[in-house]
Amino acid sequence: MVAVKTMVEGGKATTGPPLGPALGPLGLNLGQVVKDINEKTKNFAGMQVPVTVNVIDPATKKYEIIVGVPPTSALLKKELGIEKGASKKKEKIAGNATLEQIKKVAESKRSALLSYNMKGAVLEVLGSAVSLGITVDGRDPKEVQKMIKNGEIEI
C-alpha cells in the first residue's frame, strides 16, 4: 500500500502539486481522486486540511481518502473570522473569543488532542490562542488557563 499525505485547502484540491506529481505515477484517475477529496473537505472551506490518500491496490486502482482535522489555529481563525494571528502578541490582539467559542473548537478537535477530558482539551486550545494573540472574553488566555486550573471557571 502506498500512502500520500498532504495539506489541501478545503474543497479546493487540484490535480497540480502536491497531489498530481505524487499520485500520477501510480496510475490513478487524478480527476476522480481530486473530486473525492474536494467532496470530503468542502466543509473546511478556507482552511488547510490534512489529507491522506491510501492506494490500497495499485493494480485495481483502489484507494481510500482519510481527512484529518484541521490545525487548531485554523479552527480558531475560522471561528473568529480572522485571516491570521497577531504578529506581535504582546502589543497586538488578533481577535477576542468567547469561552463558548473555545469550547466549540476543543470539541471539534477532541479526537486529535492528547487530552483525556474536555477540560484538558480547552486548556490545549487556549494554548493555541496564546500563540495566535487571541484573547478570551477580553482576558489573556494564560489567565483563563490559570482560572480553569484553580477551579474558578468550570468546564
From Swiss-Prot:
Self-association state and partner proteins as the record states: Part of the ribosomal stalk of the 50S ribosomal subunit. Interacts with L10 and the large rRNA to form the base of the stalk. L10 forms an elongated spine to which L12 dimers bind in a sequential fashion forming a multimeric L10(L12)X complex.
Keyword Cell membrane: no
HAMAP family, alphabetized: Ribosomal_uL11 (MF_00736)
Name of the gene: rpl11
UniProt keywords, alphabetically: Ribonucleoprotein, Ribosomal protein, RNA-binding, rRNA-binding
A Pfam family it matches: Ribosomal_L11_N
NCBIfam families noted in UniProt: PRK01143.1
Family: Belongs to the universal ribosomal protein uL11 family.
Statement: the UniProt record of this protein carries the keyword Plastid: no
GO-annotated biological processes: translation
Free-text function comment from the UniProt entry: Forms part of the ribosomal stalk which helps the ribosome interact with GTP-bound translation factors.
GO molecular function, one term: large ribosomal subunit rRNA binding
GO CC entries: large ribosomal subunit
Organism this protein belongs to: Picrophilus torridus (strain ATCC 700027 / DSM 9790 / JCM 10055 / NBRC 100828 / KAW 2/3)
Descriptive protein name: Large ribosomal subunit protein uL11
